[in-house]
Amino acid sequence: MQKGQRPSTQLRFLIIVILVIGIFFRFFNLSRKVYWPDETFTSLRIAGYTKTEVVEKLYNGQVIGVEYLQNYQRLNSEKGIWDTIKGLALEEPQHTPFYYLIARGWAQLFGDSVATIRSLSAWISLLAFPCIYWLCIELFNSPVTGWVAIALLSISPFHVLYAQEARPSSLWTVAILLSSAALLRAMRQSKNIAGWGIYTATVIVSLYSFLFSGLVMIGHGIYVFAIERFRINKTVIAYLIASCTGILTLAPWGYAVTANLAQATTTTNWSGTKVSLFILLTMWAGNLSRLFFDSGLGSNDSLIKLLPLITVILPILLLFGYAIGFVIRQTPKSVWLFILALGSVTFLALVLPDLILGGRRSGVARYPIPCYLAIQLAVSHLIATHITHHRRQKLWRIVFIALLTGGILSCTISSQAQVWWNKGPERTKYNPQIAQIVNRAAKPLIISDAKLDIVQSLGYLLDPKVQLQLVIEPNIPKIADNFSDIFLYRPSRTLRSGIEQAQGYKTEPAYQGSEIWLYRLSK
């Protein structure tokens, strides 16, 4: 493929069609999937509340309605932007505030329904298309690669899923692509101060989108120093100034992280939960394959369900390996080194602690996004090169069509689902069925001592007639007898046994899967 070669009319038409399909899936059925606990925290932050004050108001044993429960997920005149920032700083300092401030402004303009809040991520995700095209032009000087990259990104099941989630992942994806393209542009026009100013601005946006952007910055730094042969010249100095400016700009939030480090550690300690190497490998393979194909299965599913997918996952992983090797062999150092630097720093920062200390950080699908983008760049260039090479056009066109078809099928299936692997199925998998059972009752009451985010997630599926009685373990509520049906939702052993022993109720499963989340009370 010649540098600067333009795509054919047929290829351009195909990719435009794929792009339209990808955009459609980003906005289709936005409110279909469960609003999972992590997303309820997004709404909590947008509303300006802290978890502590909401628990204090709700978990007191008083009977409340669903509307009252959900009031703390909605905007109100009592809370402002400062409350959003304060809530993040105190309870989730590992999350930088840029996305949440944008989301609050979005909610003020368009409303705070599930579809509206999620649509912000969908709109932001559209910015990734021009950004990845620009990056391909700067990196490969190849419009064909840029068009192929747009097609693969637009219909990628992984990126479509996170474009429909009320979390910062889409914003971070755009920030990574934008800062990477801006860096290459600034290096190419090293004497242009404006170029480095733009890169500085993208670094600030990246850092305030997600703290792991620091790893992307390190990758950029390795690339700059290596390309400049570790000499301190104008390009290196300009990069250092841009990076230091970004870090200094982040200093106020760095203080918040330091001041509330214990809270950040407590909130994220789940990622340090030890898992076997086999589970870790399964998570890596599953996450990587979801760039092009997604069956909906997660790492917690049984091996019997996962085994048949090897016939799909293995070829995709082999394609990734071949693409990386192809780029290293066939492109200049300035190209392949950038791809390796972009992906490897984040990869090593996540994988090494897991292998040495134990944990599952590297298996969290949204953390290695820089790695995914590096792989997608390599695959895009591999396909773009071969579909314009006459000897191998037919084979690689088949590969290209297969990847696009896999993405379309995956997005079609996932768009109809209420629970998917990215919606915390270990916390939400039975909620749709549970909500149906409760909503069928004439005058139902739900009693629970489950965590706030768990209860609020279920609340989005409940009818307004449903009443709730929430307590903090080991408290046992006094149950009124003016309800047609009384349910226990995900009760602790203390709550269940306390109600049985102290108030003479019998508990029996109202819905039973592999775990029992809902009990019905009777006397």
Q: Can you say where each PLM-predicted feature lies in the sequence?
A:
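Hydrophobic/aromatic-rich transmembrane helices and adjacent perimembrane loops
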Residues: L337, G359-T388
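Transmembrane-helix signature of polytopic, membrane-embedded enzymes
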Residues: I132-I155
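Interfacial juxtamembrane loops and adjacent helix segments
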Residues: A47-H95, Y99, A107-F110
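Signature aromatic-anchored transmembrane alpha helix within multi-pass, membrane-resident enzymes
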Residues: M1, I16-V17, I328-P332, I383-I413
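Perimembrane helix-loop-helix junctions
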Residues: A182-Y199, V203, L215-I247
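Specific aromatic-rich, kink-prone transmembrane helix
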Residues: C131, A151-I155, L161, L171-S190, ...
